[in-house]
A protein has these predicted regions:
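Gly-rich Lys/Arg/Thr-decorated short loops/hinges at beta-loop-alpha junctions or inter-strand turns
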Residues: 8-15, 53-68, 87, 131-154
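Flexible, glycine/charged-enriched surface loops at secondary-structure junctions
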Residues: 119-123, 223-235, 283-302, 358-373, ...
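C-terminal non-catalytic interaction/assembly regions of soluble proteins
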Residues: 2, 312-471
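N-terminal glycine-rich anion-binding loops that anchor highly charged ligand groups
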Residues: 41-59
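Active-site glycine-rich loop that binds ribose-phosphate moieties when present
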Residues: 157-171
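A conserved active-site cap/scaffold subdomain adjacent to cofactor or substrate pockets
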Residues: 207-314
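Catalytic or ion-translocation cores adjacent to nucleophile or general acid/base/metal-coordination motifs
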Residues: 115-131, 190-231
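N-terminal amphipathic/basic leader segments beginning at the initiator methionine
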Residues: 2-34
Length: 471
């Protein structure tokens, strides 16, 4: 069945629900959101935002180890509860859960649809964010030098932040599901709004308003009270049944934020303002691939229980450059932990750290934390811990870590921590160790014209592309 192009709507509301704010979010979140979208009726989109910078780095590592991996590992669990209902109700799904392998994610969704006995959905994959290949090598090297990166840096991968245009084009071409890799988080919302309302691509004010709606949605339950909660200071009811956010976007881009009825959490001026300012370095110039948003005259107004309206956002022309995240190998991270309890537990944990420093002295700096004494507020050199007198903590967990270019050298830490079982000091237990490759991240800017975003449809049989377009 060929894709059915969508017709832009100039009036009414577009409801966009968010069912994930990061990779590893709750997999039962989408159900109540889809229930609410179906009950409300009208055009609706379900987004999953699962791709932080570190998440993409981990996905790149996964694909290097296994060419079939590299997309969101929880993808089947996220979609299985709602895929059939979304397709039946005409709710489009848009997500960056493609990570380092969007085509692999599309094939995974087709496999899930077959498992559920569904007709093959029309899945579009957005590509163009990967700028690590030969075509971009010279431009990327120039951009890295301009950013002050180490001249010896060897990129493992490089991904540009794409905007909303290819998402909008895919939806207009009839996609039921749009799978992206690296796109700007708000663009997951801007794309559907751009396609639905038929805005011009230089309608900066409307694009800015939709961008801020997407910004409110992108972290999931941060805006419905999750990350906001601080008992006795900022109380939030029902954290165990936290509702995920829904934005009702009108034809001018203004939005009302809410959540499904009967779910936990809260949506009010406080939660919305906190998320509105999240990661916003300059409120007058929030840079995205789609627009530069200005919230200096924005108004946040409570219009009812768990309903907040955002207005007054303005926009300016989008930047001429796109941000690029470049990942490069930085060696191996080795970690080890062991617990000490009872009388003189802290003294024994400190002695264990001293033993490890002596045994691993030739490998470089060793970080040692005493969880329960000094860890989050400790420093890599251990000066803060050393400055504290040995106390009487009776429940202490020692954590040590080091980074080394050589895997075998880093692995020595894991063996030395395990050896503390019998080599002392007394009473150590609960050893846990880990060894994993580590990627560093450098950001730079590429001229927009050097990054070509496009989409193509991925048929269920894996045959040739059914349709293709460039943004």
């Amino acid at each position: 069945m060929p894709p059915t192009p969508a017709t832009p709507q100039r009036h009414g509301l577009l409801r966009v629900g968010c069912a994930a704010g990061f990779s590893g979010d709750r997999t039962d979140a989408a159900g109540p959101v889809v229930d609410a979208l179906i009950a409300a009726g009208g055009p609706a989109v379900l987004i999953f935002e699962t791709l932080a910078e570190r998440t993409l780095a981990l996905a790149q590592l996964a694909r290097h180890a296994d060419p079939d991996a590299g997309y969101e590992p929880l993808l089947p669990e996220l979609l299985r509860p709602v895929l059939a209902r979304c397709l039946a109700a005409g709710i489009r799904i848009v997500s960056n859960f493609g990570a380092a392998h969007p085509a692999g994610a599309a094939r995974c969704i087709h496999a899930l649809a077959r498992e559920l006995g569904l007709a093959p959905p029309r899945i579009a994959v957005v590509s163009g964010d990967d700028v690590s290949g030969p075509a971009h090598r010279a431009a990327l090297a120039t951009a890295l030098r301009a950013a002050g990166a180490d001249a010896d840096l060897q990129p493992v991968s490089a991904n540009a932040y794409l905007g909303a245009e290819a998402i909008a084009d895919a939806l207009r071409a009839g996609a039921e599901i749009v799978v992206c890799g690296r796109v700007a988080d708000p663009s997951l919302t801007v794309g559907p709004a751009l396609a639905h309302f038929g805005w011009a691509r230089d309608d900066w004010h409307r694009l800015a308003r939709a961008t801020m709606a997407g910004h409110l949605l992108e972290c999931g339950t941060q805006v419905t009270g999750g990350y906001y909660a601080d008992p006795g200071f900022k109380d939030v009811p029902g954290l165990a049944t936290l509702g995920y956010p829904i934005a009702e976007i009108d034809a001018d881009g203004h939005c009302t934020l809410t959540k499904p009825a009967g779910t936990g959490g809260r949506v009010d001026a406080h939660t919305v303002k906190e998320q509105l300012l999240y990661e916003l370095h300059d409120p007058a110039a929030y840079l995205t691939p789609d627009v530069v948003a200005d919230i200096t005259e924005a108004e946040v107004c409570e219009t009812g229980p768990d309903r907040v309206r955002l207005t007054g956002v303005r926009g300016q022309a989008r930047p001429d450059t796109l941000k690029v995240n470049v990942f490069h190998a930085t060696g191996w991270l080795a970690e080890g932990e062991i617990s000490y309890a009872g009388a003189r537990a802290e003294a024994r944990a400190r002695l264990a750290a001293d033993v490890l420093r002596e045994r691993l002295a030739g490998l470089g700096p060793l970080r040692a934390d005493l969880i329960g004494v000094a860890s989050l507020f400790n420093d890599d050199a251990g000066q803060r811990l050393a400055a504290l007198p040995t106390g009487e903590a009776r429940d202490v967990r020692l954590r040590v870590a080091l980074n080394h270019a050589d895997r075998a050298a880093a692995e020595r830490l894991t063996r030395e921590v395990t050896a503390l079982y019998c080599c002392g000091p007394a009473g150590g237990g609960g050893v846990r160790t880990a060894l994993r490759p580590r990627l560093g991240t450098v950001s730079c800017l590429l001229p927009r014209e050097q990054v070509q975003a496009r989409f193509h449809f991925v048929p269920a049989d894996g045959a040739a592309q059914a349709a293709e377009g460039a943004a």
